[in-house]
Amino acid sequence: MNKQQLAAKIWESANKMRSKIEANEYKDYILGFIFYKFLSETEVTRLHADGMGNEDLEELREDDTETAQYVRDLCGYFISYDNLFSTWVAKKGDFAIANVRDALSAFDRNIDPARKRVFAGIFDTLQTGLSKLGTDEKSRSKAARDLIYLIKDIPMDSRQDYDTLGFIYEYLISNFASNAGKKAGEFYTPSEVSQLMSEIVAWHLAGREEINIYDPTSGSGSLLIHIGQAVARRNGNPNDIRYYAQELKENTYNLTRMNLVMRGILPDNIVARNGDTLKSDWPWFDTDETKDETYEPLFVDAVVSNPPYSQNWEPPEAGEDIRFEYGIAPKSKADYAFLLHDLYHLRDDGIMTIVLPHGVLFRGGEEGTIRRNLVENHHIQAIIGLPANIFFGTGIPTIVMVLRKHRDDDHVLIVDASKYFTKEGKNNKLRASDIKRIVDAVTGNRDVDKFSRLVGIDEIRQNDYNLNIPRYVDSSDNAESWDVYSTMFGGIPKRDIDALSKYWTVFPGLRRCLFAEENGHSAKLAVQDVREAVNADSDVKAYIQRYREAFIDYPAYMRGELVGNAANVSIAAEEETLTNDLLRRLAGIPLVDAYAAYQVLDDSWQKTISIDLETIQAEGHDAVRKVDANMVVKKKGGKDVEVPDGWVGHILPFDLVQGKFLTSDLAEIATFESRLSEIGGEIADILENLDEDDKSSTDAVSEDGDSFVAAELKKAVKSIGKNPETDFDRALVSAQRLFDEEREVKKNVKNLRSALDEKTRTVIEGLSDEHADDLLAAKWVEPLQRKLEELPQTAVDELIAAVNALNDKYSTTYSDVCEQIEQAEAELGNMLDQLTGNEFDMAGIAELKTLLGGE
C-alpha cells in the first residue's frame, strides 16, 4: 500500500477500535504508540548502523549501564530489548498492558539529560490513559495489542519513511480533529491554512541560512512543520531551521514534540515548553539556577500561530509587560494579546502570520487602540479573509493577518478570499489554486478586482482604523440590471454586449458575426445556433490552435522531467518547477484561468504522480513491474477479515495496461457484455408483452409483475415440455432460454476476466524498461494533457453561455408578457362561462370574471 492507502486503513480500523472512547482521547493513545514504535525502530536502526547485530540487541538491558549510556549518547534515550516495540509484537498473545506501563516508566528513567527538554514526560498522556482502554487488565491488554498490530506496518527506517510516517500522523490528527467536536478540534490547524501561512513566510525568509521559527500556541505542531518544510524547499538545508514551540495543554504539548521528532527534525533543533504563553513569556535561560547569568529574550525570524479565539485571560496592568506597549486586550478577548506577543518576539527583519477571528478588524475600545497603533507603525502587511467553516469545531469567519516588525510601506493589502474554496464533508477547504491565488496577491502586493486591494493609510484613518474587509474590497456579484428599452421592445442592449469586451478583444470578428445592430441602442442575434457559429469562427479556431501550439511539446517535456528522471527527481521541489513551466506556456494566452490550469496540475501531482514517484524512489524502478494481491474484506467466523481476491498493479492500473497491450481480449469481453445487455432487454420485452391476466395466473412472475421468479420459471417451463401450445407458454420458454444463455455468458465473462487478469499480471511483470516508461507516461502525462487541452474550450463555452443568456433575457418583451396574460385571462374567462352552480357560486364566479377583465 502507498501512504494514502495505509493511512486510510489505519484510520478506519482505529475509528472502529476506539468504541466508546472519545476521538480526542483515543488520538493520544494511538499517536503515542506510533511515536513509541518510531523511537524503538530509530534506536535499532542506529545500533545496526553502528555495527550491532540482532543477537547483540537481545543483550540490551538497563542494568548494563555502559551500553545504556552509549545508547543514550547515540539516540538521546535508551530502550531495553524487552521494551522494544518489535519485542511487544513478537510476544503475540503473551503481550500484556503491564509491558507498556513498565516500558514507559523505564523510558523516563533513561533519557539523556541533554535531551530532557525534548523527551521528558512525552508519554505521560499515554501512560495515564492506559486505564481507559478497557475495564480490566485482560480487555486493556487486548485493546493495546490490537493497536500495536494495527500500526506495526508503518515504515520508519528511511528518509522516505519520514514522509510516510509524517503523512499518516497528520492524516490521523486531521481525522481525529474533524471527529472531535467543537472544543477538541481546536488543537489542529487544517493543513491548507498551514500551507497558506507557510508559503508567505517562506517567501519572506528566502535566502537566509539559519532560521528560527516559533509557534506560541503550537497545538499538534503541524503549523510549525509546514513552515519548516516550505522554508527548507526554498533554502535547501532543513537542519538549519530551529523550532520553538509553546503549548498550554500537556497532552497537546506532547503531541507537538512527537510530531516534530518524527519528521526527522534534530532534537537539538527542537525547543518546546509546556506553559501559558500569555502568563509565562519566553525569557530564555539554561536552568533556573543560572537564569540570572544566562537570561536571553527570544527573538526569531518568523512567528506563526493559531491561538484560541476570543479567549479569557488575566491582563497585566498597563506598562507592566513590554509585550503590550500598544495596548491591553480586553479580559474576555485575548486575540490581540496573542498578536502582540507574537510581534514582540520577531527580529527586526522578521515576519509573522496569525489566525484570528474576523472581529479583531472592527471591534472598538482597547482593541481599536491596538489596531490604530499597529496601522500607524506600519506593522500590518496584509489581511486575508478566509472562507467560513474552514476550521474544525467552529464556523465563525476567520482571517490570517501578516505582520512585520519593521516595514516602510504605509499600505495594507486587504484580501477577500471568502469565496475561494471547495466543500469537503462538513467543512470548507482551500484548494491548491486558492492558496496560490492568495500567496501571489500577498507576495506581489497585487490589486485584483473583487479579490484584493492595496489600501493606503489615509483611507484607513478616514475609516477610523476599522479594517473590516467589505469596506475596502467588494467581492459581491454584480447586481443584475435590466434595460428598460430592451425590456419593452426587445433586442440585446449594446452595453450588455460591450460587457463581454474581454472576448471581443481576443475574437475581433466574432461580435459582428453574432449580432446585427437594430439601432444605436440594441442589437439582435444574427445566428440560429450560437455554439455552432462561435466554434466555426476563424478567430476562435486560431485561438484554440495557438493554445495547442503552446503545449505541443508538453508531453515530451513532462516525460523528460518525470519519467526519465523518476529515480532522482526532487519530489519536494519538482511541482514548483512544473508550475513555472506551465505558467510560462500560458503567458500571453488570454481568457484561460492560470489558476484553473494550476489546479489541474496540482490534482495530478498530489493524487497520482508524487505518490508513484515516492514508491519508485523507495523501491526502485522494478516497482513499476510489481503486482499485489487485491485484498478485500469478507466475513469469516463473524468477523471482518482481509482475504486476497485477484491482483492489482503496484503502480500501473490493470485497465491502463489492458488498454495498451491486451485490446483484443478487452474486445472479446466487450462482445459478451454487449450480449448480456441485449439479453436483459429481450427478457424485459417478453415481460412487458405478457397479458396482465397471464402474469397473475403464474408463480413464474413476481407479484408486482416486474420480474421473473427464477425457480418458479424453471418449474413452469419443465411442466410445459417441448411443445408449448399457447403464446404465454412460448413466452415462458423463451424467457428461460434467455436466462440459460445469460448464465453461460456471465460464466464466460468471468472466466475471460480471470484469464485477462493473469495475462495482465504477466505483461506487467515482463515489461521492458521502455514499455514501463511508456505506461508511466500514459498514467501521468496523458490525462493531464487532456484536461489542460479542455481549458481554452471552457473559456469559449463561457462566452457561448453568456451570449445565450443575454438572448434569453430579452427574447420576451413586456408587451409579450402582457399579451400572454391577456390570453390566459381570456381562456380562463371562457372556462368560467362553462361552470354552473347555485346563486352564491355564480356570484363568486362573476366577481372573478370582473377581476380578470371579463364582463
Model-predicted segments: where are they?
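Hydrophobic alpha-helical scaffolding
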Residues: 137, 158, 217, 245-249, ...
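Non-catalytic, mostly N-terminal accessory regions of nucleic-acid modification and defense proteins
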Residues: 1-201, 268-277, 385-388, 412-418, ...
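Conserved S-adenosyl-L-methionine
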Residues: 183-305, 310-314, 320-327, 337, ...
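Short, contiguous acidic/charged loop-to-helix segments that flank catalytic cores in large enzymes
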Residues: 314-334, 358-366, 387-392, 425-427, ...
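Conserved Class I SAM-dependent methyltransferase catalytic core
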Residues: 5, 9-10, 16, 22-38, ...
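Conserved P-loop NTPase
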Residues: 398-442
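Active-site lining segments that contact anionic ligands and/or coordinate catalytic metals
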Residues: 299-300, 333-335, 349-351, 377-381, ...
